[in-house]
Amino acid sequence: MQPHLDNNSNNDDVKLDTLGEQNVLSSAENITLPEDTFKSYMTYLLYEMAHYKPMIFSFLALSVSILIVVIFHNVKACDVVFGFSIFVTSILFLSTLIPFNVYISDEGFRIKLLLEVITHRPAVKGKEWRAITDNMNQYLLDNGLWSTRYYFYSSERCYKFFRFLVKEKPPGVNVNSSVKDATSTQIDAPANEASNEVIKCFSFSSDPIFEAYFVKAVEVEKQAQQEYWRKQYPDADIP
């Protein structure tokens, strides 16, 4: 009698897991990301630039300099001074474009991303990444790390950021060159070796919490990669 009850319990757990996955995928389809909101990437970029304060200040300074030169164009001394000011403000304006697309390095943000991956266990190119992207965009806005809710333009860009994070050595880690690249090769390593390499690489991390989440997220990504490539090459006997 007991085995029969155990089987029913296992079946119920499987059904609940399946329903849970279906609910996550269904909700992910209803999420609106910047790529769905804006007509093109250029319009998205212009919108972001208009809400980026350093960009706004530089643009105003450049506009004022040009206006002053136009008004006082008959004064030779002013032409030299204001011409130089236009050059300087132009450099400042262009320099704001460099940090505009730099990866955010806030540790809380990165831990949040790792936990999102651990929780949702997304497949490679899976719809779960839409939910993760939406949550991360909201987190950035709520914590004042970005001025809009559109930091990640698409789920693909969020996934690329995660891959960048996985391959990056966290600050405070002191490892030798033979172990330094462990995270960049963990996807191709056998299952029983990947975790050991990652743990060895981060055994000197100054943040054990980040280290623990990092290792777990790497394992989730490794499983997703293996499943993805098994489906792509079913006859390749991929471990």
From Swiss-Prot:
Transmembrane intervals: 55-75, 80-104
A Pfam family that the UniProt record links to this protein: DUP
Membrane topology: Multi-pass membrane protein
Topology feature Extracellular, residues: 76-79
Main location: membrane
Alphabetical UniProt keywords: Membrane, Transmembrane, Transmembrane helix
Coiled coil: none
Protein family per UniProt: Belongs to the DUP/COS family.
Protein name: DUP240 protein DFP3
Annotated organism of origin: Saccharomyces cerevisiae (strain ATCC 204508 / S288c)
